[in-house]
């Protein structure tokens, strides 16, 4: 019986405890209705949550009416919300499918906290898992993407992964439970529906049991992934430092590109980018690779990883405090790099700060000849990202201080100094 199989699966996968409160995602379709009926009949404490995305006109409102009647019939508390999905997708510049997913799961999490539910139960089943495997395979994926849908992801649990779509329909027929049909599921409109309606039937002509074969493969790969992920995690301790990914240690691994994929793919880098990053490991420093939120920079010995933040090029990322005082025989020049001392009379033009630029030069303190700032930073073994964040304090057109590093010898304190100006980073 379906109900007993689902209960055994819940216990086997440790999805939740008998006394836990469940928030069931209820669209009104066959899968979610079956999930609610199975859990409610089994005695679990359920509340339901329904989203009206207003994407299918009257159909969307029909679905809402149906779930209201269903929950009222069985005395199940129902939470309902409305979304302007099209507007959200336009504002976020994402697909309608992605917009609906983000809106749905963000709201589910909010309702879960408000009602005190322990988990959010969603109605993915074996056929969904097969379609996910194929979808990821077509798009390009690593071993994790070939595992299909997993029983648990944080607070999201999937009790129906032990049964398929055909069994769900048969269960609903046996208990005399109706449901609503989403017309888009019958149209060749979205990628997943192309897999469901076109690709899988072709595969079944070759192997009528292809769905079962893929589920068995997924279960086998799950065991393989456990070993694989353990090896990747161990490698991370050798390769990743607070500064970045050590290129020499990475190249000592048997499969550097696989390691890069598992590290960078979750950060939004696609397979082609990761291959380019792997090819850059033996090249010159300076190459940059960008995902939506992250940047990888090929430096001399490291791959630098940093989040992309919009920067105000005209505003210092720290504060400078200025102090002016008489120069006396007992004055001691501070040694900290965060502090710079100048002869006040030599700072005789407008003082301003900016990012250093290509071609900038200064005379480092204690020297007599000019040096390019780019060469100075290279000699100091600054990484590319550190160079990009370096600011200078200028007196007119001349650089007086490579901030936090070294002052210019032309503004030094000497025996003729009467007043000193001190700048300090805070």
Curated annotation (Swiss-Prot):
<dbReference type="InterPro" id="IPR012795">
    <property type="entry name" value="tRNA_Ile_lys_synt_N"/>
</dbReference>
<feature type="binding site">
    <location>
        <begin position="27"/>
        <end position="32"/>
    </location>
    <ligand>
        <name>ATP</name>
    </ligand>
</feature>
<comment type="similarity">
    <text>Belongs to the tRNA(Ile)-lysidine synthase family.</text>
</comment>
<comment type="function">
    <text>Ligates lysine onto the cytidine present at position 34 of the AUA codon-specific tRNA(Ile) that contains the anticodon CAU, in an ATP-dependent manner. Cytidine is converted to lysidine, thus changing the amino acid specificity of the tRNA from methionine to isoleucine.</text>
</comment>
<dbReference type="InterPro" id="IPR011063">
    <property type="entry name" value="TilS/TtcA_N"/>
</dbReference>
<keyword id="KW-0819">tRNA processing</keyword>
<dbReference type="InterPro" id="IPR012796">
    <property type="entry name" value="Lysidine-tRNA-synth_C"/>
</dbReference>
<protein>
    <recommendedName>
        <fullName>tRNA(Ile)-lysidine synthase</fullName>
        <ecNumber>6.3.4.19</ecNumber>
    </recommendedName>
</protein>
<keyword id="KW-0547">Nucleotide-binding</keyword>
<dbReference type="GO" id="GO:0005737">
    <property type="term" value="C:cytoplasm"/>
</dbReference>
<dbReference type="GO" id="GO:0032267">
    <property type="term" value="F:tRNA(Ile)-lysidine synthase activity"/>
</dbReference>
<dbReference type="Pfam" id="PF01171">
    <property type="entry name" value="ATP_bind_3"/>
</dbReference>
<dbReference type="InterPro" id="IPR012094">
    <property type="entry name" value="tRNA_Ile_lys_synt"/>
</dbReference>
<dbReference type="InterPro" id="IPR014729">
    <property type="entry name" value="Rossmann-like_a/b/a_fold"/>
</dbReference>
<keyword id="KW-0067">ATP-binding</keyword>
<dbReference type="GO" id="GO:0006400">
    <property type="term" value="P:tRNA modification"/>
</dbReference>
<keyword id="KW-0963">Cytoplasm</keyword>
<keyword id="KW-0436">Ligase</keyword>
<dbReference type="GO" id="GO:0005524">
    <property type="term" value="F:ATP binding"/>
</dbReference>
């Amino acid at each position: 019986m379906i109900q007993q199989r689902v209960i055994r699966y819940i216990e086997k996968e440790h999805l939740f405890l008998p006394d836990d409160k469940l928030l069931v995602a209820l669209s009104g379709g066959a899968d979610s209705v079956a999930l609610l009926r199975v859990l409610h009949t089994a005695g679990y404490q359920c509340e339901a949550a329904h989203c009206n995305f207003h994407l299918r006109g009257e159909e969307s409102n029909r679905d809402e009416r149906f779930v209201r009647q269903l929950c009222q019939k069985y005395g199940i508390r129902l939470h309902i919300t409305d979304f302007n999905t099209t507007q959200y997708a336009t504002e976020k510049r994402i697909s309608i499918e992605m917009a609906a997913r983000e809106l749905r799961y963000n709201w589910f999490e909010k309702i879960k906290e408000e009602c005190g539910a322990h988990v959010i139960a969603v109605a993915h089943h074996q056929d969904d898992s097969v379609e996910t495997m194929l979808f990821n395979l077509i798009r390009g994926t690593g071993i994790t993407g070939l595992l299909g849908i997993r029983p648990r992801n944080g607070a999201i649990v999937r009790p129906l992964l032990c049964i398929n779509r055909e069994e769900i329909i048969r269960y609903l027929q046996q208990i005399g439970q109706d449901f609503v049909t989403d017309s888009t599921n019958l149209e060749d409109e979205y990628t997943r529906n192309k897999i469901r309606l076109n690709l899988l039937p072709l595969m079944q002509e070759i192997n009528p049991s292809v769905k079962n074969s893929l589920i068995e493969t997924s279960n086998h790969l799950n065991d393989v992934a456990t070993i694989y992920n353990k090896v990747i995690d161990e490698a991370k301790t050798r390769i990743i430092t607070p500064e970045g990914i050590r290129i020499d240690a990475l190249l000592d691994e048997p499969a550097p590109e696989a390691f890069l994929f598992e590290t960078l793919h979750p950060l939004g880098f696609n397979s082609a980018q990761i291959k380019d990053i792997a090819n850059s490991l033996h090249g010159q420093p300076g190459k940059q690779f960008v995902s939506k939120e992250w940047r990888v920079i090929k430096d001399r010995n490291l791959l630098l990883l940093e989040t992309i933040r919009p920067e105000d090029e005209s505003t210092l990322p720290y504060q400078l405090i200025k102090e002016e005082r008489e120069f006396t025989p007992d004055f001691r020049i501070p040694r900290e790099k965060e502090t710079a001392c100048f002869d006040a009379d030599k700072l005789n033009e407008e003082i301003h700060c900016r990012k250093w630029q290509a071609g900038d030069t200064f005379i480092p303190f204690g020297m007599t000849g000019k040096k390019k700032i780019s060469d100075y930073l290279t000699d100091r073994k600054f990484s590319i990202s550190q160079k990009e964040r370096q600011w200078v304090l200028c007196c007119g057109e001349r650089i007086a201080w490579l901030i936090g590093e070294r002052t210019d010898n032309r503004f030094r304190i000497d025996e003729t100094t009467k007043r000193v100006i001190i700048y300090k980073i805070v």
